């Protein structure tokens, strides 16, 4: 009997899977995001990341952006993803130039990760920079709740 239990228990555990959070749609073009923002009267959440070199950015994706809480809050925003990778081959030349322009315009301190909230008129409403990589996302969630 113990043998059967020891045999079947690992099989049962293999069958368990975490249900991933629903994916959100990040736009990659500022003009498109602003157009939708005006149409839907929603603020734009701009996320500046260094996807291939920034450890806090990678952790923030896992700890915040891949959660059900973020999925629900994201419905209040138009989402704009601005990647500044070290490997420029990850982006087209056009996307690289677009992202660099927004980086210079909206991320003047050059910090990563950075969340910037823009009004439908394109004005900066608020910013939140950094991530302590501890799994603590309550400050980010409060920021998103406050600025929707």
Language model segments and positions:
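Extracellular/periplasmic catalytic domains that process cell-envelope and extracellular macromolecules
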Residues: 38-39, 72-74, 107-111
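Thiol-based oxidoreductase modules, predominantly thioredoxin-like and allied folds used
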Residues: 24-27, 70-97
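Typically the conserved alpha-helix immediately C-terminal to a functionally engaged Cys/Sec
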Residues: 56-73
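Active-site-proximal beta-strand/loop segments in catalytic clefts of secreted hydrolases
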Residues: 48-50, 82-85, 120, 129-131
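Bacterial Sec-dependent N-terminal signal peptides
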Residues: 1-19
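Non-catalytic, surface beta->alpha helical segment in thiol-disulfide oxidoreductase systems
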Residues: 63-64, 104-148
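A short beta-strand-turn-helix
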Residues: 26-44
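Short active-site neighborhood of thiol/selenol oxidoreductases, capturing the structured segment around
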Residues: 40-54, 79
């Amino acid at each position: 009997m113990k043998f059967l239990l020891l045999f079947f228990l690992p099989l049962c555990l293999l069958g368990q899977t975490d249900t991933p959070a629903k994916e959100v749609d990040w736009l990659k073009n500022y003009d498109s995001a602003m157009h939708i923002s005006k149409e839907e009267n929603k603020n734009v959440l701009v996320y500046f990341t260094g996807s291939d070199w920034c450890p806090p950015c990678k952790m923030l994706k896992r700890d915040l952006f891949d959660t059900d809480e973020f999925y629900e809050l994201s419905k209040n925003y138009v989402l704009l993803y601005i990647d500044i990778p070290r490997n420029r081959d990850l982006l087209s030349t056009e996307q690289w130039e677009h992202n660099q322009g927004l980086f210079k315009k909206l991320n003047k301190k050059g910090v990563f990760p950075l969340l910037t909230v823009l009004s439908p008129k394109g004005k900066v409403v608020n910013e939140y920079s950094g991530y302590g990589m501890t799994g603590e996302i309550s400050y980010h969630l409060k920021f998103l709740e406050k600025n929707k």
